[in-house]
Amino acid sequence: MKIIFLGTGAAIPTKHRNHSSVGIKYDGEVFLFDCGEGTQRQMIYTDISPMKINNIFISHLHGDHILGLAGLLQSIGFNGRTEPINIYGPPEIKNTIENILKIGYHSINFKITVHEINSKKPMKIIDSEKYMAYAYPVNHSIPCYAYILKEKKKPQLNLKKAMELGVEVGPDLKSLKDGNEVKLKNGKIIYPNDVLLPPKDSMCVAYSGDTMPIEDFGEFLNSIGCTVLIHEATFGSSKKNNAVETMHSTIEDAVNIGKIACVDTVILTHISARYDDNIEIYYNEIENIIKNNNEYNDNNFKIIVAEDLMEYDLKNKETIKK
């Protein structure tokens, strides 16, 4: 699973930061979280193929998070896509997509299924064989949802034990791995628990959207085993009043939620244009947070400031900057 930051700015794009968008590559698919203006152009500089996008998650309907959708969908259509796309979002997302599809004399010949979320509680919105996704209502000036993508891990097969019990290479091994019992030629029944090892830890990413800090959100992430939190940090902590007035988060807010969530890594994004030529404020504050809080001074807990086109590999816990 790999995260690619297509846009890490806030309301106004800058020479260093595009409008909000994050792509996650997993098992041949691309999951797109928000689609600010210019998102499809940012993809040109990455290994994301728009044709591999099957699910788009829109946190809320502010322009800096959705104004890239029209161009992206039209370009996908121009390239001959026929596979359907799912779009998830808050109330009014259906009307928004309908209006988008009226723009530009498009050639869209694929089905777009819009899933309008209207829940005040966390809800599972996708449950497939390989992954699941959740929506979590957060606290912003308009309806807004965070999203969580979690890998499903199957138990590992203890091949040596299976061979010792007389299971032959072939369909029986797959059946056991899928959780089914099998009957051998000699009549002996082998149960999954006889040959399966516990699954390895699964990878899980949360994307906060725009929000004030919510401790319950952190606790929910902890309960499902989230490993990486992408959290908005529009302001440095000296601008706490600005954050409260605009219903956003500060650096310290985001880091605190990450610690409550017990994630390995917090990645800060949605950074105000006021810091475009003074991003050192973020690095200095992170250094002070770690220095002054023993619980953050942990080699297993990382705080990263996102940059446009930066990549983060969850398996190797590696950051790649371009």
Curated annotation (Swiss-Prot):
Provide the GO MF annotations for this entry: 3'-tRNA processing endoribonuclease activity; zinc ion binding
What SMART domains does the record point to?
Lactamase_B
Q: Does the keyword tRNA processing apply?
A: yes
- EC assignment: 3.1.26.11
Going by the UniProt record, its keywords in alphabetical order are: Endonuclease, Hydrolase, Metal-binding, Nuclease, tRNA processing, Zinc
Superkingdom of the source species: Archaea
Task: List ligand-binding residues for Zn(2+) 2.
Answer: 64-65, 210, 270
Q: What is this protein called?
A: Ribonuclease Z
Gene source species: Methanococcus aeolicus (strain ATCC BAA-1280 / DSM 17508 / OCM 812 / Nankai-3)
InterPro entries for the chain: Metallo-B-lactamas, RibonucZ/Hydroxyglut_hydro, RNase_Z/BN
Entry function: Zinc phosphodiesterase, which displays some tRNA 3'-processing endonuclease activity. Probably involved in tRNA maturation, by removing a 3'-trailer from precursor tRNA.
